[in-house]
Amino acid sequence: MIHTLTLNTAIDMNMFCDPLKPSAVNRTRHTEYCPNGKGVNVSLILNHYQQPTHIIGIFGGFTGRYIVEELRQKKIKVTPAWVSEPPRINIFINDGAEEYKLVNPGAKIDDECKQQVIHHLQCVASGDYLAISGSLPPGIESRFYAEIIELCQQKRCEVILDISHPVLRQLLELRPLLIKPNDDELAGNLGLDVSNHQQVREAMRTLHQLGARNVLLTMGAELPYFSDGEGVWFCSARKIALVSSACAGDAALGAFLSKWLNKEDVAHALALASATGADVAGSAGLGKLQRTEELLQQIQVVQL
């Protein structure tokens, strides 16, 4: 079973407008709302590719209940930890020329809710996987990540990390199965530049030395890299018209896990990750995933 953990769920508001003008009334052409949370997105993609998945997350208020019911209608198992406050609302603006991301911190989480999360995680078992994705809400300290990873290690459950917190460097000492940083996170948290293939190879080498066993590197709307410590793979394909890169990395991770954890060929898993991420980057939210097969035919995977 592939479990996902989202500690800071959200509602995403995707707004589309003409180029923004300061100190003027900027009217939107249309707006789309969708439930979000990085682990939630990973599970939605896993479910799309017919992989059993289980969402564990913190939800609150009417909107939190709405998200949980929507996920259950898709036949996805959800185990919520409840708080009284509703999920945060994140705003993504595309004005035709630029993309703007306004991300809120989320509601403060109390100790009772944290204990709910730990209780729910007792379900993980030997041979399972837990993907920990997203930011920490106020009230949860960074050591909570290590507590969760150590619990999983006791139960022989492998851990996948997709977090932007600077504590990632310390967590690598716990040797997670896979990490999924993006280029901005590597630069900001680890001082690693990945502007070209050579820098990517050097960054991958550093990440493995720090403790990562496998690395899936995403680049927003660009194409991903993968390293298992022995080789580095890269996808090449034409670029898509960007609508929103907000969920592209989550989609790429979910697609990659759907194949890689089933021991399928790395090149095929990476190609599907690339095609799925590109499809989502050309949509608001996760979109309808209608172009993935078309995009897949345009992708070549090369080993550097």
Swiss-Prot record:
Pfam family, one: PfkB
Keyword Transcription: no
GO molecular function, one term: ATP binding
Residue numbers annotated as active site: D250 (proton acceptor)
Record's keyword terms, sorted: ATP-binding, Carbohydrate metabolism, Kinase, Magnesium, Nucleotide-binding, Transferase
Pathway noted in the entry: Carbohydrate degradation
EC class: transferase
GO cellular component terms attached to this protein's record: cytosol
Enzyme nomenclature, EC number: 2.7.1.234
Cofactor(s) the record lists: Mg(2+)
Entry function: Kinase involved in a D-tagatose catabolic pathway. Catalyzes the phosphorylation of D-tagatose-1-phosphate (Tag-1P) to D-tagatose-1,6-bisphosphate.
Family, per entry: Belongs to the carbohydrate kinase PfkB family.
Descriptive protein name: D-tagatose-1-phosphate kinase
Species this chain originates from: Klebsiella oxytoca
Lineage, highest ranks first: Bacteria, Pseudomonadati, Pseudomonadota, Gammaproteobacteria, Enterobacterales
Gene name of the record: tagK
